[in-house]
């Protein structure tokens, strides 16, 4: 169970002003300081700083979101003049270290998950986002604009070792297919990709570079270049991602 503690004043019968609010959980307390006013006009101007929190000490609903282990730290400033939280201006940063995460639409855990995220009102900046999945390592730097509506995501992806069958299906569907479907249906993504060592079935490719565009149910990998034991690789790959069906791709 959880309780909320608060301190404040009632300067007049029609309003309440709080200057400290704390969410008290069985093993951790999350404090917020500043001003929160109800009644005679709404106002929030508060700072939340958690310190380092161990994921197992947090509520069960967080584990249900897929995060199973790691350490989280959050520092946010929240300002607003309307009760609707979607209108509030949120700035600050969030960090995750040593994370273990299960993401809907991806087969297998994301391991050694590290993230440092800078938050602004309509923009989220992933300063660092790295993890390992099924023997591959991925590091991402990206900016997400318009994240409250249809996100526009730009940035770069780097990998020392990547199994390309995570993206290009060997059978009917890839291990991250459902996740890609969701992204392609809800977002617009443009990412530069650099892979030191890539593999697909029996093909090994070095110094692989490409640009990925994802939108409107389609994954478009262009400006594709690399070196294999059979020579130079170049081309473009367009993958249609119909929900719950095999991918249709042109090479």
Task: Please name every model-derived segment.
Residues 1-5, 9-17, 28-124, 136-222, ...:
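Membrane-proximal interfacial segments on either side of biological membranes
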